[in-house]
Amino acid sequence: DYRLAWSPSPGRSDEIVIVEMDEESFSQPELNIWPWPRRFHAQVLRNLAAAGASVIGVDMILAGTSSNVQCPPGQDPFFWTPPLSPDDEALVSALKDAGNIVLAMEVVQEEVGGDEASGELIAANFPLPEFEEAALALSSVNLPKDLDGVARRYLTSVTHQDVVWPSTAIRLVSVHQDL
């Protein structure tokens, strides 16, 4: 921890732009809601694509629809899929139009002896299938934490059901470099 704290920071790059949702974002009256409507995300993605971004990474898992439609009587809610909301449709459209967006997925680990890092990879959380189909690719956002809650390691990939999912950083660089 001390070695990292005393290490010089890498130089700034004009090639990488990070757009984050932070306290300042939430202080804006029109953005002071959570979750943000997916049309907000769609507009941000459209703006980034219009600005010429070579690749866009979204590091939050966009699972489930934002529809408030209730499961019809007589349907098994486990097997019923609600329709996409207009906000979800706007996001699908933005993903398709940009054509260069990498979405997040994560593999869930089962802790062994109270240590998540030594856990077995047991399940995965994926974006809504319509989002996954519209995106260029998926990447892993797994970031294991030590017992004290600090992330000191970075996984370059995770494997789930014999599929290797590269980390977001690896996937974004490979798309940017046409690898």
Describe each model-derived feature in a short phrase.
Residues 1-179:
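Non-transmembrane functional regions of envelope-associated proteins
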